[in-house]
Amino acid sequence: MNTKLVVVFLLSAILFVSVTASRPGKDLERDEAYETYDDERPYFKRACKDNLPAATCSNVKANNNCSSEKYKTNCAKTCGEC
């Protein structure tokens, strides 16, 4: 009975070590890459475009409404947020 208990304990210890060693976030270089990625605003860099029609964004810029968060995001190209 004791040998079975020892074998079960060793197998569970090996399983625990293998699971915790493969968790994301243990690699410092990868964590640093995530931090720099979060600091950037990739949604403006990847696709700098207007989500609203061109006429709407032109009117927003003409009326100086680019400071509104709604238009700052949806008319990013026209308002110069890229």
Curated annotation (Swiss-Prot):
Residues 48-82 form the ShKT domain. Residues 22-46 form a propeptide. It holds the Pfam family ShK. It is found in: Secreted; Nematocyst. GO terms for molecular function: toxin activity. Residues 70-71 are annotated as: Theoritically crucial for binding to potassium channels. GO terms for cellular component: extracellular region; nematocyst. Its main location: secreted. Keywords: Cleavage on pair of basic residues, Disulfide bond, Nematocyst, Secreted, Signal, Toxin. Residues 1-21 form the signal peptide. Disulfide bonds join 48-82, 57-75, 66-79. The keyword Magnesium does not apply. InterPro entries: ShKT_dom (IPR003582). PROSITE patterns: SHKT. The 52-Leu-Pro-53 bond exists only in the trans-isomerization. Negative results: has no effect on hKv1.1/KCNA1, hKv1.2/KCNA2, hKv1.3/KCNA3, hKv11.1/KCNH2/ERG1, hKCa1.1/KCNMA1, hKCa3.1/KCNN4, and hNav1.4/SCN4A (when tested at 100 nM). Probable toxin with unknown function. In contrast to similar toxins, this toxin does not inhibit voltage-gated potassium channels (tested at 100 nM). Does not show antimicrobial activities against bacteria and yeasts. Belongs to the sea anemone type 1 potassium channel toxin family. Type 1b subfamily. This is U-actitoxin-Oulsp2. It comes from Oulactis sp.
